[in-house]
């Protein structure tokens, strides 16, 4: 299953950054610096945009398994923003990334990635250019229904 806390842990594993540089994107997201002169690192934002089922659920015993496509967005602001955005476009070729997603029963979609730029405000200072990458992954939800399957009546 892929949700926001799991996505954060995957990104933490991939990038190995301090917690302050990995932030969820919210509607009022600006460059999350306290000091506008803090150019030490590149800020990474993340947000799950949508979750969409694409086939019917399958029942295995008392468990229902539903395949889901999860669309999410990564944003990068700082000195390495473009470089980090470009690396996301190659994630399927990195075994560490593949393993990080596999550990949570997820897989990056190869053809569903777009990188683009977007200007964001910097709290009254000059705007910054943000690199944005939209991508998706396949995952599944497993639910224990506590019900005996209808086709297995005894």
For each of these PLM feature ranges, what is it?
Residues 64-80, 88, 127-141:
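Oligomerization/assembly interface segments of phage tail-like spikes and tubes
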Residues 144-146:
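Peripheral, non-catalytic regulatory segments
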Residues 6-10, 83, 87, 91:
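Long, highly charged amphipathic alpha-helices
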Residues 40-47, 72-83:
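Short, well-structured hydrophobic secondary-structure segments
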Residues 93-142:
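Acidic-leaning, charged glycine-interspersed low-complexity segments
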């Amino acid at each position: 299953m892929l949700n926001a806390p799991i996505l954060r842990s995957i990104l933490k594993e991939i990038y190995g950054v301090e917690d302050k540089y990995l932030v969820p994107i919210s509607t009022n997201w600006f460059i999350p610096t306290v000091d506008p002169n803090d150019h030490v690192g590149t800020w990474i934002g993340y947000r799950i945009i949508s979750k969409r089922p694409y086939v019917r659920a399958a029942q295995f015993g008392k468990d229902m398994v539903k395949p889901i496509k999860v669309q999410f967005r990564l944003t990068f602001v700082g000195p390495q923003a473009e470089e980090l955005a470009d690396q996301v476009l190659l994630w399927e070729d990195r075994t560490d990334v593949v393993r990080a997603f596999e550990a949570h029963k997820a897989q990056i979609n190869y053809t569903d990635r777009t990188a683009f730029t977007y200007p964001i405000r910097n709290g009254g200072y000059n705007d910054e250019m943000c690199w944005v990458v939209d991508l998706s992954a396949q995952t599944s939800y497993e639910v224990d229904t506590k019900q005996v399957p209808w086709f297995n009546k005894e």
